[in-house]
Amino acid sequence: MTLEEQFLSYLKNERSYSPKTVLAYQKDLAAAKKFWQENGGFPGWDQISRRDLEIYLLATGQKLASSTLSRKLSSLKSFYRFLTRRGLVKADPTVAIQLRRGKKKLPEFFYQDEVGQVIRSLNDGKPLTVRNRAIVALFYATGMRLSELTDLKIKQLDLENGMILVHGKGNKDRYVFFDQESKKYLEEYLQAARPSLLKNEPDTGAVFLNKLGRPISSRGIAKAVQQIFQKAGLTAGAHPHELRHSFATAMLNNGADLRSVQELLGHEDLSTTQIYTHVSMQHLTVEYRQHFPRK
């Protein structure tokens, strides 16, 4: 039996939980697992870190009531408590995680100069570095999801017009755009670094490749982003989701219409996009208090 199956069997047979309650736990575990599979890869329950959980709760919490998010965290806490007591995992990553009641945590993001600092640090000309520079630039310029960038094919790129046809969630297509600087980094990767990485491997048409010349995985991209930001001295726990947040926040801070940002992000519900207006207001409040002349 899988770890999930052992846990669900324990709830049903030893704790005598109702079928409805057991099903709720099953759905909560499946939702978390699916999120990680689509956003960095799922290495196994014994490899999930506190940071993985925080990213999941942050992303999920933008579109759920606080009570629903609390239930999801409670399910994961119960699951890991079971696993640790049975010796099925060594550590419980949920131990130190608490939700602030009644208030959703605002998305974490990077300022434009911070992203610029990271991009400028990727300058040694090595194929993987050129690839990583293109990845960071595209994440920030387009706001694409990790799964969307991972699955990106060359045929989806329109370099001349600075556009990408993105195959989003629920088989919904949309166009995103990128600037001249990102175009330069992408072209440098496609023209020199990608052929160097590809070597004698069959060309699948995937835009981003790993060091073996094969399509890079979501987890490979997530790991690369984390290492890039850590090496640049910004944070030890950066995730592609935060570059997506950074794109949305930058657009709104510079006067973009909320519905336009919704379209670019591929959000089905406007309320999911509205969380970024709170981030923008928080930023503006800080700027006002720092720079308004009357103290």
From Swiss-Prot:
Q: Does the keyword DNA-binding apply?
A: yes
Q: List the disulfide bonds.
A: none
Provide the Tyr recombinase domain boundaries. 105-289
Q: Which UniProt keywords apply?
A: Cell cycle, Cell division, Chromosome partition, Cytoplasm, DNA integration, DNA recombination, DNA-binding
Query: Which InterPro entries does this chain map to?
Result: CB, DNA_brk_join_enz, Integrase-like_cat_sf, Integrase_catalytic, Integrase_recombinase_N, Integrase_SAM-like_N, Recomb_XerC, Tyrosine_recombinase_XerC/XerD
Q: Name one GO molecular function term.
A: tyrosine-based site-specific recombinase activity
The cellular location(s) given in this protein's UniProt record come to: Cytoplasm
- Which parts of the sequence belong to the Core-binding (CB) domain? 1-84
Keyword match Cell cycle: yes
**What residues form the catalytic site here?**
R145, K169, H241, R244, H267, Y276 (o-(3'-phospho-dna)-tyrosine intermediate)
Q: How does it assemble?
A: Forms a cyclic heterotetrameric complex composed of two molecules of XerC and two molecules of XerD.
What protein family is recorded? Belongs to the 'phage' integrase family. XerC subfamily.
Q: Matching NCBIfam families, A to Z?
A: PRK00283.1 (NF001399), recomb_XerA_Arch (NF040815), recomb_XerC (TIGR02224)
- Function description: Site-specific tyrosine recombinase, which acts by catalyzing the cutting and rejoining of the recombining DNA molecules. The XerC-XerD complex is essential to convert dimers of the bacterial chromosome into monomers to permit their segregation at cell division. It also contributes to the segregational stability of plasmids.
What is the designated name of this protein? Answer: Tyrosine recombinase XerC
Q: Which organism is it from?
A: Lactobacillus delbrueckii subsp. bulgaricus (strain ATCC 11842 / DSM 20081 / BCRC 10696 / JCM 1002 / NBRC 13953 / NCIMB 11778 / NCTC 12712 / WDCM 00102 / Lb 14)
Gene behind this chain? Answer: xerC
